[in-house]
Design a protein with these regions (language model features):
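Nuclease catalytic cores that cleave nucleic-acid phosphodiester bonds
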Residues: 1-104
């Protein structure tokens, strides 16, 4: 599964193309409206407007074998600790070796 912190993610279209090419499900998580997809492999989740609601939703589900795309460094840290592969929208990879420095 690919989880996308979708509220301010500039690469949603690219993520969807790559996921479709590889047959991987995508869940877009946001506090506000998302454009519906006809693709059964794409899931939209609208969370409450509460602070960090989208981050909490993703962090509670992401784990080994999942990919998380986010520019939110604290969320990246939570997901790395849960065993997910995490990258920012620019392609920056967050991992155990660099997440401590990124959150500092």
């Amino acid at each position: 599964m690919i989880y996308v912190d979708a509220d301010a993610c500039p690469v949603k279209p690219e993520v969807l193309k790559v996921a479709e090419r590889h047959g991987v499900e995508v869940t877009l998580v946001a506090n506000s409206g998302l454009r519906p997809s006809r693709d059964p492999m794409v899931h939209n989740v609208i969370v409450s407007g509460a602070f960090d609601a989208a981050d909490d939703w993703i962090a509670e589900r992401a784990g080994p074998g999942d990919i998380v795309i986010t520019a939110d460094v604290p969320l990246a840290g939570r997901c790395v600790r849960a065993g997910a592969l995490v990258t920012g929208p620019t392609g920056r990879v967050f991992d155990e070796a660099n997440i401590g420095m990124a959150t500092a």
